[in-house]
């Protein structure tokens, strides 16, 4: 009977990453909701966070962080 609990826990851990795939950005509305813009190419300070459709990528503006040395 205990093996059922172990198998259930194993399957839960094994299949949990697949739940994130349904949260992918794949439309203009989802892109804008995440603070992105639909562009043909993500250039400069924009980085790709998803796709709007087959031609456009969802790009988000990101300011590079200053690297500080820890003394």
Curated annotation (Swiss-Prot):
One of its GO terms (cellular component) is extracellular region. Keywords: Antibiotic, Antimicrobial, Defensin, Disulfide bond, Pyrrolidone carboxylic acid, Secreted, Signal. It is found in: Secreted. This is Beta-defensin 7. Residues 23-25 form a propeptide. Pfam families: Defensin_beta. InterPro entries: Defensin_beta-like. It comes from the Eukaryota. Belongs to the beta-defensin family. LAP/TAP subfamily. Residues 1-22 form the signal peptide. Disulfide bonds join 31-58, 38-52, 42-59. GO terms for biological process: defense response to bacterium. It comes from Mus musculus (Mouse). Has bactericidal activity. The gene is Defb7. The modification Pyrrolidone carboxylic acid is found at residue 23.
């Amino acid at each position: 009977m205990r093996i059922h609990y172990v198998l259930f826990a194993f399957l839960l851990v094994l299949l949990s990453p697949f739940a994130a795939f349904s949260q992918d950005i794949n439309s203009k509305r989802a892109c804008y909701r995440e603070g992105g813009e639909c562009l043909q190419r993500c250039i400069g300070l924009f980085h790709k966070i998803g796709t709007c459709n087959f031609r456009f990528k969802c790009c988000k503006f990101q300011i590079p962080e200053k690297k500080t040395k820890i003394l």
